[in-house]
From Swiss-Prot:
Gene this protein is translated from: rplU
Keyword RNA-binding set for record: yes
Region forming the signal peptide: none
Name of the protein in its database record: Large ribosomal subunit protein bL21
Reported function: This protein binds to 23S rRNA in the presence of protein L20.
Length: 216
């Protein structure tokens, strides 16, 4: 039996015994985790999810926390900054060994769900977003939801950030330069995926700019 699972925005075809390198998970070596986003199960009977196969899961043992090969990015700052520089980056990964594929019963297995380290560190940011509790409110209340909180920084001072992008950041719970300046690589990856920035944070040099702007 094999399964096609999704984690960290990527898809992997796996079977029991496979060693897999995935984006860093919030788990320690020796722990068993369960991937619940299973797109397809194959074998004697093929089951395709819509989008995921109900009650299916892939269990794996965390072997080690590792780093991928170094990637060099050429960063060119625009608008207020004209400097250019190169930046090296090694993606943090987790090495896991697939131990079992569950066609059913995954929901009640009791095994810890595989969760990206970036998702865990961004939990507070996601919880701070007022969007879920405001859906049933009138239109005026929804507009107020997107407005900056009192004392919030002017995020439009960041390179490439206009009114629309500022609104998107605020809705994601980001209201100050101090928050952005404190982002880790995992936070950057999580915000990239959550708000579909497609590498904009590093490309525009937001973290460096935020550190300077936070000083006042």
């Amino acid at each position: 039996m094999f399964a096609v699972l999704k984690t960290g925005g990527k898809q992997y075809k796996v079977q029991a015994g496979d060693m897999l390198r995935v984006e860093k998970l919030a788990a320690d070596a020796g722990e068993t985790v369960q991937f619940n986003e299973v797109l397809m199960l194959g074998g004697e009977n093929t089951v395709v999810g819509a989008p995921f196969v109900k009650d299916a899961g892939v269990q794996a043992e965390v072997v080690d926390q590792i780093k991928g090969e170094k990637v060099i990015n050429f960063v060119k700052r625009r608008r207020k900054h004209s400097s250019k520089r190169t930046k090296g980056h090694r993606q943090k990964l987790t090495l896991v060994k697939v131990t079992d594929i569950l066609a059913s019963g995954a929901d009640k297995s009791g095994v810890k769900a595989a969760m990206g380290a970036g998702s865990v560190s961004a939990t507070a940011v996601a919880a701070a977003a007022p969007k879920p509790t405001k859906k049933a409110a009138p239109a005026k209340a929804e507009k107020a939801e997107a407005a900056p909180a009192a004392g919030a920084d002017d995020l439009k001072k960041l390179s490439g950030v206009g009114p629309a992008l500022e609104k998107k950041l605020i809705e994601g719970g980001v209201t100050s330069f101090a928050q952005i300046a404190a982002w880790t690589e995992a936070d950057v990856a999580a915000m990239d995926e959550k708000l579909s920035f497609k590498g904009r944070i590093e490309r525009e040099g937001w973290i460096e700019q935020a550190k300077e702007l936070a000083k006042g």
